[in-house]
Amino acid sequence: MRRIIGFVTMFFLAVTVVFGKSQENVIDITFNKLGAVYHKNESGNAVCKVIKANNDITYEVVVEIVDIDKKPIGYKKTYTLSSPFERYYYVPFQFSELGYYYLSVSFLHGDKVIFSKQEGFGVIPDVTLTKKDYDSPFGVGAHYARYGDWRVAEIQQALGIAWVRDVARWKDFIGTARNTPDPFIDYLDRHNICWLPILDYVDANHGWRDENGIWRWDEDVTNIKKYVEMNENRILVYESQNEPSNFAGWNKRWPHPQGQKWRPQGWGVPFTDLVKQMHDSIKAVNGDIKLIWPGEEEWIEYFDDNREDVANHIDFTAIHPYILWRKYPETSPFYDGFYKIQKEMLKKRNIPTEIWVTETGWTTYLPDSIRRHFPPVTEYQQAQYLVRNYLVQLYFGAGKMFWYELVEEPFGVHHPESGFGILRYNTMLTVKPAAVAFANMVNNYRYLKPIGKYLAKDRKTYGFIYENEKESGAPVLSIWREADEKEELIPVKYTKSLTEIGRAHV
C-alpha cells in the first residue's frame, strides 16, 4: 500500500510461538507504562522475565527490539545460559520516530527457536486530551464497567479520542434519593473525555397496552427521567437504545413475520411508542437535551409511517455501518451514496439530517470452521481500515464516529467480539497497531475539513482533499490504494507544499 500523509497504519501483534511444552518455558514482558504507549523521545523501558525448567541444556536467550517491518533497530542482547534458570532483563528504549514496535524474546538451542514471545508497543504524537473537545468527530465505544479496570480512561486520554460511547446505568439508581450526577461523569471529566450515554436496555416485557392502543413503559420511563434529572447540566445528548432488533426481548415478544429480526415489522411499533415517551420525559427535564434514535436500514421510515408525530420526536439518528463480508471501507454502500439518499429521506420527512455512526469496526479474531458475519482481518489491516473508514464516512456525511471498541473482550480467540478492540485485554492494556493509527489520525486530521474528493485514474485509488481550519496554507491531499501498491502521478500547483503532502508514514 502507498504510504501517504495523514495516516499511520502500523504492523503486527505480539505473537507467541511454542514448540516445546509451555509449562517449561516462561517469558513475561512488562512495560513500565500503562498501555505501552509512549511519545516521541520519551524514555521507556520493559522488564523481560525468562524461565527455563529443563536441566543441563545450554540456551541462547535473545532480547531484541524490531520495527514495524521486523527489522532490527539497534537493540539486541544475547545471553548464554544453562537451564534451569530464571532471569530478569531490563530493556531501555527511546524513539524519535512514530510507529509500532515490538520487543522480542527468544530461546534458541543451536539454530532452532525453542520458544519465543513478542509484545508490541507504540510511539505516538502528543495528542493527550487537555480539555473536553465536544466538536471532535472522533469517538470510541467501550464497556468500562465490564472491563473492571478503570485505568483505561488514562489510555483513551493519551490517544486523544475525545468521545466514549458507554452504557448509562440508570437502573442502578432506582429507589435512591441521589441528586448529584452519575459518578461516571466525574470519572470521565477527570480525563477530559466526553460521554455519549446509551440508556441501558428497557425490557420489552415491561410494556403494556393502554385503552388507546399505545404501548407504555411508565415505570421505566419515569426512572429514566429521574436519571436524566440527576445529570441535567452535565449531559446534553443520550442514545435511546442499542439495537432493539438484538437485545432486551423486542424481537422475541414481537417477532418479524418471516423471522427477519433485524427488520422492524413486528417490534417496530411498540419500540416507537417507547422512544417517543422517553423523548417527552427527557424534554420535560431540559428542552435542549437531544435523544438519538436508531436509524438502520428502513427503521426510521417504518417508525414514521406506523405511528403519529414521530418526526417531532427525533432529534437525530445513528447507524451501525459494519461492512460484514464486503471487506474494504471503500466497497461499502456508504461510499456510493448512502448518506445522500438517507439525508434526502430524512429531510422529506422533516427529520433532522444529522447522522452519527455509533458503532463500526473490524475484528482481528482467528477464524475457525464456523462462518461468521464479520470478516477476520489482520492487525495491520484493522489499523488501515480504521483510518480509511473514518475518512470515508466523515467525508460523505457522518457527524461523529465511534469505533467498536476500545478494549478486546475475553470471549476466546475465535469469537468475533474478542477482536474489535484497539487495546489488548491484558494486565497493562497494551496498544494494538490500530490504537497507534487512531492517535496519528487524531493528530493529522482533527482540524482538517474535507473540501473535495480526489479523482484518481484507477478505480482502486481513493482520496480526499482537505483544508486546515486552524492554519492557512495550501490544501492537504490524502490518498491510498484499496489493497496493493501503485504509483500515482499527482499534479501539484504549489511545489513548496510537496514536503507536507508527500510525507510518508505508512
Q: Where are the predicted features?
A:
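Active-site cleft segment of glycoside hydrolase catalytic domains centered on the general acid/base Glu
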Residues: 147, 177-179, 205-341, 367-388, ...
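Hydrophobic faces of well-ordered beta-strands that scaffold small-molecule active sites
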Residues: 136-142, 164-166, 195-199, 236-240, ...
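Aromatic-lined carbohydrate-recognition surfaces of secreted/lumenal glycan-active proteins
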Residues: 141, 273-302, 348-366, 398-409
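Mature N-terminal, pre-catalytic/accessory segment of carbohydrate-active enzymes
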Residues: 20-159
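Catalytic domains of carbohydrate-active enzymes, especially glycoside hydrolases
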Residues: 140, 144-173, 183-187, 193-196
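Aromatic/acidic polysaccharide-binding cleft in carbohydrate-active enzymes
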Residues: 362-439, 454-459
